[in-house]
């Protein structure tokens, strides 16, 4: 539900012609980082989706995916890039980042898919994300 909440916040904060950016770090499996861990019984319903699905606007995002402690880390990074390409939001590579562009829903869906990939295939990973809308400068 983390991505439903973050997407809900971003979509509801959006204003036409107003520049806005989000910087976020999503991680799982960090050794020793369990103090705030908790399990809440929840269902699979994305509670914000029904309220934001009609909000349409394009975003630019730069992402970095870090599979920690993996000798074959480049294979995991390549899988993440391929996922973005297959979903039609991969724009280009830059220095240590991939640039994603597209509708806010499509970009957030890919971010969630990348996170799920990490959850299913890695014990420790970090997804660093910047999302921008209405930037006055070329991203």
Show where each model-derived region lies.
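Charge-rich, low-complexity N-terminal segments
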Residues: 1-139
């Amino acid at each position: 539900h983390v991505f439903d909440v973050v997407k809900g916040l971003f979509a509801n904060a959006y204003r036409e012609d107003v520049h806005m950016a989000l910087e976020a770090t999503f991680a799982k499996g960090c050794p020793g980082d369990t103090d705030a861990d908790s399990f809440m019984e929840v269902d699979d319903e994305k509670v914000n989706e029904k309220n934001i699905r009609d909000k349409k606007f394009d975003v630019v995002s730069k992402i970095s995916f870090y599979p920690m402690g993996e000798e074959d880390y480049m294979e995991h990074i390549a899988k993440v890039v391929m996922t973005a390409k297959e979903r039609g939001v991969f724009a280009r590579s830059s220095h240590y980042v991939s640039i994603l562009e597209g509708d806010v829903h499509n970009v957030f869906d890919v971010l969630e898919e990348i996170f799920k990939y990490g959850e299913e295939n890695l014990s420790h990973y970090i997804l660093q994300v910047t999302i921008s809308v209405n930037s006055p400068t070329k991203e």
